[in-house]
């Protein structure tokens, strides 16, 4: 037996409280709160900038912004990426979308983190199964209760 999936197994389950179902025009997808993903990486690897981190490279055209994100863990030599995402710089109204770089970066980061196993259950389509989501929600609820009890015991 190897430890090849040690991190994947710690990162794969997503707390349903930090997901949203949205319609993208081609069907519904589950989105994941990026702050939750950052918290999950911090839980497993330590603080951003110490146990893990990311780099972002932006490229702009007249109409688009591209964000290339690379993720590193434990040592900067353990790096994955870049993973790219693109967003339109202009809204349909003709106004500049000043959130476009952030949207591109967040999407690229989510994609890069998925390769490490973060929220693998969402990307594997398991959130399309309501029984699975209920089971994971119950697991997280129980885990959160035990953390609250532990915190009360330490005060």
Where are these regions (language model features)?
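Interfaces that engage single-stranded nucleic acids at replication/repair/recombination sites
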Residues: 2, 6, 132-155
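Positively charged, aromatic-enriched nucleic acid-contacting surfaces
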Residues: 32-138
């Amino acid at each position: 037996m190897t430890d090849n999936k040690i991190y994947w197994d710690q990162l794969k389950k997503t707390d349903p409280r930090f997901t949203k179902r949205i319609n993208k025009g081609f069907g519904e997808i589950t989105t994941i709160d990026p702050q939750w993903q950052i918290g999950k990486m911090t839980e497993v690897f330590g603080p951003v900038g110490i146990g893990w981190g990311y780099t972002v490279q932006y490229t702009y055209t007249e109409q688009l912004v591209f964000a290339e994100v690379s993720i590193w863990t434990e040592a900067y030599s353990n790096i994955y990426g870049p993973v790219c995402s693109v967003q339109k710089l202009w809204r349909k109204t003709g106004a500049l979308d000043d959130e476009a770089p952030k949207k591109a970066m967040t999407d690229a980061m989510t994609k890069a983190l998925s390769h490490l196993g973060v929220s693998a259950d969402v990307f594997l389509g398991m959130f399309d199964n309501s029984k699975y989501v209920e089971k994971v929600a119950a697991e997280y609820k129980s885990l959160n209760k035990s953390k609250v009890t532990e915190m009360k015991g330490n005060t």
